[in-house]
Design a protein with these regions (language model features):
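Structured loop/turn residues at beta-strand edges in well-structured enzyme cores
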Residues: 68-71, 211, 418
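Short beta-strand-loop/turn "lid" adjacent to the catalytic site in phosphate-handling enzymes
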Residues: 64-101, 130-136, 169-192, 217-218, ...
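Auxiliary, metal-adjacent structural segments of Zn-dependent hydrolase domains
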Residues: 210-211, 334
């Protein structure tokens, strides 16, 4: 009997392969980074072939660097950066353009036109989304309208669209399987989340031929098997590909948030707060998003979601652009050296603001800066006085991450009618104790960090394992979850409320900054 499940975790900056055992423990992992492409201001692209090859390299490395053998693998599960859009020629297998990444803002003007056409309510009702350049639909239209030959290929039924998991599955199966799962389809702005089908009106409105769209399947089932003849992956031939899910719902599943009202927050490049709402779709009145979290068998479960575009990326900005820190640990050390941010508020709206604001034209700003900073290379500095040092700025960055999540949590509580009693966390930045303590203080509830923080990959592994009987059911999976540390509120509520009020004022300063 196979011993393990292999998860492919294809992210924004790297591709990873992680092997899990029956207890959800990591047996082996490998990672391969790839290049980010910035053709113009606000544009972000990836090379689809580099995505593919980096993922294949991670897979070969996970076997070569460990004692795990391909015959030990029961199934493969895939999780991916959502919304990122790839289109390719079904005959040659070659992409017609670079992947347009979820962060890319090139379709902001098109989104304004869609709003002007009065489509907001229809899109919100049918797809559970707001109109934003974030989602795949406008990216597809951009490629069809701007890449020479793309629309002609579509009209000849020779063009295929997919988010990243679709691209990987198509290639792993030798071009035999063109599918997506409910969670990824829910992020295209083209999918009817109630009737679980592509929405004809949206496709017609955006002039997107439905023939290019993948078939939508549950998140846990055998889609196909790894084909023979894939260079470097020859020994994986015949292994079932049995799970596919977007990165954030994957983390929700990996955190064993199986009951309505259970929630997780992932601190990665951005921050993503999701709450399981069960088989009931919650329609948000606070600009949060509704989508299918996962489908298993003939049932789907929904999630309500809020996202902040910049979180861990801000710490990287401090390191790479301002040269204030050498690594993320140094940011924590600086932040811990001061009791507060000394009145500083940093709004990390580098690519606009996500929920609940959805302001494509917001830009990053720092307000309340005082004299004394040695690295004052900021886009917007307001209120210079004396007394601030870089420790205050480092702390303001961590506080900004926590403030953004507080915005989302309060909106989510209002929409769902549920008061949070616990927040489960994961992602790279969740290793920061000071960040999680600030978070607990701001949301006034328990924050718990599991022993396994690779919950995105774990969720994909669980779904694949369920499909092939490696795990019996969700009860068995839930027993695997172990808590590493719990954070409880330490700050007086009155002080917390005062700080949060200042954050709201700072956000208003950043809004509409890039609008003509």
């Amino acid at each position: 009997m196979a011993k393990y499940v292999l998860a492919l975790d294809q992210g924004t900056t790297s591709s990873r392969a992680i092997v899990f055992d029956k207890k959800g423990n990591i047996v082996a992992k490998a990672q391969k980074e790839f290049d980010q492409i910035y053709p113009a201001a606000g544009w972000v692209e990836h090379d689809p072939m580099e995505i593919l090859f980096s993922q294949f390299q991670a897979v070969t490395s996970v076997f070569s660097s460990s004692g795990v053998k391909p015959e030990d693998i029961a199934a493969i599960g895939i999780t991916n950066q959502r919304e990122t859009t790839i289109m390719w020629d079904r005959e040659t297998g070659k992409p017609v353009y670079n992947a347009i990444v979820w962060q890319c803002r090139r379709t902001a003007e098109l989104c304004e036109q869609i709003k002007a056409d009065g489509m907001e309510e229809y899109i919100k009702d049918k797809t559970g989304l707001v109109i934003d350049a974030y989602f795949s639909g406008t990216k597809i239209k951009w490629i069809l309208d701007n890449v020479p030959g793309a629309r002609a290929l579509a009209e000849a039924d020779q063009l295929l669209f997919g988010t990243v998991e679709t691209w990987l599955i198509w290639n792993l199966t030798g071009g035999r399987v063109h599918i997506t799962d409910y969670s990824n389809a829910s992020r295209t702005m083209l999918f009817d989340v109630d009737n679980l089908c592509w929405d004809e009106k949206m496709c017609e409105y955006l002039n997107i031929p439905m023939s290019i769209l993948p078939e939508v399947k549950p998140s846990s089932m055998v889609y196909g098997k790894v084909a023979g003849g894939i260079i470097g992956l020859e020994d994986l031939e015949g292994i079932p590909i049995a799970g596919a899910i977007g990165d954030q719902p994957a983390a929700l599943f990996g955190q064993a948030c199986f009951e309505p009202g259970q929630a997780k927050n992932t601190y990665g490049t951005g921050c993503f707060l999701l709450m399981n709402t069960g088989e009931k779709r919650v329609k948000s009145k606070n600009n949060l998003l509704t989508g299918v979290a996962w489908g298993i068998g003939d049932k789907v479960e929904y999630a309500i979601e809020g996202s902040a575009f910049n979180a861990g990326s801000v710490i990287k900005w401090l390191r790479d652009e301002l040269h204030m820190i050498d690594n993320a640990k140094r940011c924590d050390e600086l932040a811990e050296s001061v009791p507060d941010a000394n009145g500083i508020y940093f709004v990390p709206a580098f690519t606009g603001l996500g929920a609940p604001y959805w302001d494509m034209y917001a830009r990053g700003c720092v307000v309340g800066i005082t004299r004394g900073t040695t690295k004052a290379h900021f886009g917007c500095i307001v209120g210079l006085t004396r007394g601030v040092n870089r420790a205050h700025i480092a702390r303001s960055v961590l506080e900004a991450i926590a403030y953004q999540m507080t915005d989302l949590l309060e909106a989510m509580e209002d929409d769902s009618g549920i008061t949070f009693t616990e927040l489960r966390v994961d992602g790279g930045a969740s290793v920061s104790d000071i960040l999680l303590q600030i978070q607990s203080d701001m949301i006034r509830t328990i924050v718990d960090r599991p022993k396994t923080v690779e919950t995105t990959a774990l969720g994909a592994a669980y779904l694949a394992g369920l499909a092939v009987g490696y795990w019996k059911d969700r009860d068995e999976i839930a027993q695997n979850r172990e808590i590493e540390k719990i954070f409880t509120p330490q700050m007086e509520k009155s002080h917390r409320d005062e700080l949060y009020k200042g954050w709201k004022r700072a956000v208003e300063r950043s809004r509409d900054w890039a609008k003509d």
